[in-house]
Amino acid sequence: MQDSILTTVVKDIDGEVTTLEKFAGNVLLIVNVASKCGLTPQYEQLENIQKAWVDRGFMVLGFPCNQFLEQEPGSDEEIKTYCTTTWGVTFPMFSKIEVNGEGRHPLYQKLIAAAPTAVAPEESGFYARMVSKGRAPLYPDDILWNFEKFLVGRDGKVIQRFSPDMTPEDPIVMESIKLALAK
């Protein structure tokens, strides 16, 4: 049986140690983010869906990560400033973490254990492009790249995992969120 991710200890972007329990009862989209990535414009869509559904109990949670071509090199303060001034991010952001390897954060250990594979867009060539560039994940369940997403239900259990190239406003992601909000 899957454990709730809500008891996991995390550090917010301002350095406060907390758990995700304060988000209990909400549907969450947990995303590993980066500021200098070709997928960084997804911040805009993440903010759009956060604003559209926050009143229904939906929240995006951003976890910066510098493991993919060092595309998140800044300090937490620099990341926060960039996200708020460039993309108008209002959703909760957290301290930079590792999502793969020996230093994988316990949150991502739980997320990946609950959803070892990601749903990708039909005919997506993203994984093949990563492999062709020598950037294949070390293990099949590793996070592939920045902006991989995990949808978590109100009970703290993982519902689905979405590949980095599946945008937040993709119809499959949107429908999954709507179904989770209806529960």
UniProtKB/Swiss-Prot annotation:
Top-level taxon: Bacteria
UniProt-listed Pfam families: GSHPx
Keyword Lipid metabolism: no
Chief location category: periplasm
Enzyme nomenclature, EC number: 1.11.1.24, 1.11.1.9
Keyword Oxidoreductase (UniProt): yes
Effect of a null allele: Deletion has no significant effect on the binding, transport or utilization of vitamin B12 or other cobalamins.
Subcellular location: Periplasm
Reactions accelerated catalytically: 2 glutathione + H2O2 = glutathione disulfide + 2 H2O; a hydroperoxide + [thioredoxin]-dithiol = an alcohol + [thioredoxin]-disulfide + H2O
Secretion signal, residue range per the UniProt entry: none
Record-annotated active site: C37
Keyword tags: Oxidoreductase, Periplasm, Peroxidase, Stress response
One example of a Gene Ontology biological process annotation: cellular response to oxidative stress
GO CC list: periplasmic space
Induction per the UniProt record: Induced by oxidative stress conditions.
GO MF term list: glutathione peroxidase activity; thioredoxin peroxidase activity
Protein family according to the UniProt entry: Belongs to the glutathione peroxidase family. BtuE subfamily.
HAMAP family recorded: Thiored_glutath_peroxid (MF_02061)
NCBIfam families the record matches: PRK10606.1 (NF007900)
Function: Non-specific peroxidase that can use thioredoxin or glutathione as a reducing agent. In vitro, utilizes preferentially thioredoxin A to decompose hydrogen peroxide as well as cumene-, tert-butyl-, and linoleic acid hydroperoxides, suggesting that it may have one or more organic hydroperoxide as its physiological substrate.
Name of this chain's protein: Thioredoxin/glutathione peroxidase BtuE
